[in-house]
Design a protein with these regions (language model features):
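Bacterial N-terminal signal peptides that target proteins for export
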Residues: 1-7
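Bacterial N-terminal signal peptides
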Residues: 7-15
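Extracytoplasmic copper-binding redox domains, predominantly the cupredoxin/blue-copper superfamily
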Residues: 19-219
């Protein structure tokens, strides 16, 4: 009788695990980027305003797509600290946008032969790494939202860390194609963040118990 109960329990767990689908689609950016006025350099009056020029290539890979909803597992978020790295190379931050889960560490690795002054004054995670040389430095981000990063020495350097409270997130490929896999069946809020959006955009989506649902997105 006990073996039968265990078998029934295992069958129920397998059925629950199987009730998950994928979200797929394509993201299209319809607006044209322009330069932005942002806080950058640190002068005698503190962090001053300056221009960050418009990017010279496609920005679709800079979109961050993430899910929120009651059906998502309540287990602790995955911390992929080993993969959360921002390089400083040729006076650029690479990648330009890095999505991470709340509580993750981000590692800053300088590959230039000269130092950088990495900092952010964003509310979710302000920090400062002065005269960052070849030593790899890290910063943990416990708040959610957009963290905008600059270099106090090279004023055109700019990047973003988007901290999300969900394990279900992704960024599109260069062609704009995206996929979020293994989402438990149910209704969710799908959020889209991009550096040029004044605030994240929200879409409602229902994920099936199996298979996939397609949602193309335009920004």
């Amino acid at each position: 009788m006990q073996k039968a109960s265990i078998a029934i329990l295992l069958a129920g767990c397998l059925a629950a695990a199987a009730q998950a689908g994928d979200i797929t689609g394509k993201v299209t950016l319809e607006s044209t980027p322009g330069s932005r006025k942002v806080g950058q350099t640190k002068g005698s009056a503190g962090y001053e305003k300056g221009d960050v020029p418009a990017p010279s290539e496609s920005e679709v890979e800079d979109v961050v797509i993430y899910l929120e909803g009651e059906k998502l597992p309540s287990t602790p978020l995955t911390k992929m600290s080993g993969k959360n790295t921002i390089l400083q190379k040729n006076k650029e931050f690479l990648p330009h946008v890095l999505p991470v889960t709340k509580g993750s560490k981000v590692y800053f690795r300088n590959q230039d032969p000269f130092p950088h002054h990495v900092y952010s004054v964003s509310q979710p995670g302000s920090f400062e790494i002065v005269k960052h040389g070849s030593t790899v430095r890290s910063q943990q981000f416990d708040g959610t939202g957009e963290v905008e990063i600059f270099c106090g020495i090279h004023t055109k350097m700019n990047a973003y860390i988007m901290v999300v409270d969900s394990d279900y997130f992704c960024s599109p490929s260069r062609a704009g194609v995206y996929r979020i896999s293994g989402v438990p069946a149910g209704q969710y809020s799908l959020w889209l963040w991009h550096p040029r959006l004044p605030r994240p955009a929200k879409k409602s989506i229902t994920v099936p118990a199996s298979g996939s649902v397609n949602l193309d997105l335009k920004l």
